[in-house]
Amino acid sequence: MEKIGVIVTAGGAGRRFGGEKPKQFLELSGIPVIIITLKRMVNLPIVGQVVLTVPENYIEVAGDLLSRYNLAGIKLTAGGTTRRESVLRGIRALTGNFSIIAVHDGVRPFFPKGALSEGVKKLSEGYGGAILAVPLRDTVKEVKDNVVISTLDRSRLYAVQTPQIFRREALLKGHALGEKQHLDAVDDSILVELCGETVAVIPGDYKNLKITWPEDLEFAEFLFTRYFAKELL
């Protein structure tokens, strides 16, 4: 089995979440969110190396957590001022010459365990990348100044998740473009798309929550206790 490199991004300051510390260091049943994510990731046979990016002022905190939870094999690096910069720093920190690289949000601890393997299968079919996505369940309106402008065709709209899996050369090409044009990309697939690569979609999971707002933490606690705690406790 070909091993892949994984970048886990936890470089955000969590301004939308509020509180004294970034959301990735908050706990579910006493375990930091980022540790749950990393524990589940490193246990996958397909993963050859994991690089974790965190805010520079949290390097020491993150290092202590990795040691405490027996994750010292994970390489730690400081994130940049944007997500794109953080991912690029993570790519550069990989020591293995991986032909496939996955990028994952550190605050998505409940990713499907088969996602990476499914993504690799898509790449073998000639795609430059593969992303997880789920169909939108709600009607979506375009709104300006609190007035509806249009109703979008929900059947064609998907909510994108991570991990996202890419051929190394496609991801590097995308980030080179992003760096050159100073693009503030919301995810990595858009950079790969802008380079002319085709990105495949594989089924995501509605439980693959990105912890962004304070109310997400309560729901994440429920999901962890109900579905995922047995993997770690």
Curated annotation (Swiss-Prot):
Pathway it works in: Isoprenoid biosynthesis; isopentenyl diphosphate biosynthesis via DXP pathway; isopentenyl diphosphate from 1-deoxy-D-xylulose 5-phosphate: step 2/6
Reaction catalyzed: 2-C-methyl-D-erythritol 4-phosphate + CTP + H(+) = 4-CDP-2-C-methyl-D-erythritol + diphosphate
Site (described: Positions MEP for the nucleophilic attack): R154, K210
Site feature location: Transition state stabilizer: R16, K23
EC numbers: 2.7.7.60
A Gene Ontology molecular function term of the record: 2-C-methyl-D-erythritol 4-phosphate cytidylyltransferase activity
Keywords of this entry: Isoprene biosynthesis, Nucleotidyltransferase, Transferase
Keyword 4Fe-4S (UniProt): no
InterPro entries cross-referenced by the UniProt entry: IspD, IspD/TarI, IspD/TarI_cytidylyltransf_bact, Nucleotide-diphossugar_trans
GO terms of biological process kind: isopentenyl diphosphate biosynthetic process, methylerythritol 4-phosphate pathway
Keyword Membrane applies: no
Alphabetical list of NCBIfam families matching this protein: ispD
Cited function: Catalyzes the formation of 4-diphosphocytidyl-2-C-methyl-D-erythritol from CTP and 2-C-methyl-D-erythritol 4-phosphate (MEP).
Family: Belongs to the IspD/TarI cytidylyltransferase family. IspD subfamily.
Protein name per UniProt: 2-C-methyl-D-erythritol 4-phosphate cytidylyltransferase
Species annotation: Carboxydothermus hydrogenoformans (strain ATCC BAA-161 / DSM 6008 / Z-2901)
